[in-house]
């Protein structure tokens, strides 16, 4: 199987995961619950206003599916990059031009992520250090307005992001979109101390 076909197959698998994630998110929303909201009352009894069993299972499955999605995304990026190497000047599934970073030095970081937001579903985690955000990197970053502009221009589109997490690079695909919370991402991105802001 060639790289394009493999990437397409992986994308289909990820779409299926996204569908399951949405179903599980609906279970939590229906029960007015989040990933860490209480399931017991003050006396230690299960709340009778929610389906405790369903919420517990939804939380567990969401954690598993998020991990599976992150692993799939990394495989997809690898297949796309391999295809790009074979087909000069052609991009697999993205209109983004290749970005050549001058360094792997982070320039902004994630200070908080709202549960079940586009940022959360896309794989952002608190304290992720961003070394590439679309075509932005440490070498061409000037101010936070650039991050906001890329986010706004990429509504309902994929932004390729590379972060440093636990001292290793992690590639993500973030899709800014309108959701039940504020903004298009549901996370707080702040400049790193010493960055050119």
Swiss-Prot record:
It holds the Pfam family PDZ_6. Keywords: Chaperone. InterPro entries: Nas2_N, PDZ_6, PDZ_sf, PSMD9. One of its GO terms (cellular component) is nucleus. Residues 75-166 form the PDZ domain. Gene3D superfamilies: 2.30.42.10, 6.10.140.1710. One of its GO terms (biological process) is proteasome regulatory particle assembly. Belongs to the proteasome subunit p27 family. Acts as a chaperone during the assembly of the 26S proteasome, specifically of the base subcomplex of the 19S regulatory complex (RC). This is Probable 26S proteasome non-ATPase regulatory subunit 9. It comes from Caenorhabditis elegans. The gene is psmd-9.
């Amino acid at each position: 199987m060639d790289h394009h076909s493999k990437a397409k197959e992986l994308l289909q698998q990820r779409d299926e995961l996204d569908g399951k994630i949405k179903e599980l998110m609906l279970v939590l929303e229906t029960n007015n619950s989040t990933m860490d909201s209480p399931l017991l009352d003050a006396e230690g009894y299960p709340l009778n206003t929610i389906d405790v069993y369903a919420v517990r299972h939804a939380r567990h499955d969401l954690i598993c599916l998020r991990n599976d999605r992150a692993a799939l995304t990394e495989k997809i990026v690898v297949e796309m990059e391999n295809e790009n190497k074979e087909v000069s000047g052609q991009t697999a599934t993205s209109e983004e031009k290749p970005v050549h970073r001058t360094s792997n030095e982070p320039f902004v970081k994630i200070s908080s992520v709202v549960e079940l937001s586009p940022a959360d579903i896309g794989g952002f985690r608190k304290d992720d250090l961003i070394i590439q955000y679309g075509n932005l990197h440490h070498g061409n970053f000037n101010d936070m307005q650039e991050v906001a502009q890329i986010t706004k221009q990429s509504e309902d589109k994929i932004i390729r992001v590379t972060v440093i997490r636990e001292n290793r690079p992690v590639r993500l695909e973030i899709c800014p979109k309108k959701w039940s919370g504020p903004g298009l991402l549901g996370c707080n991105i702040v400049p790193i101390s010493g960055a050119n802001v």
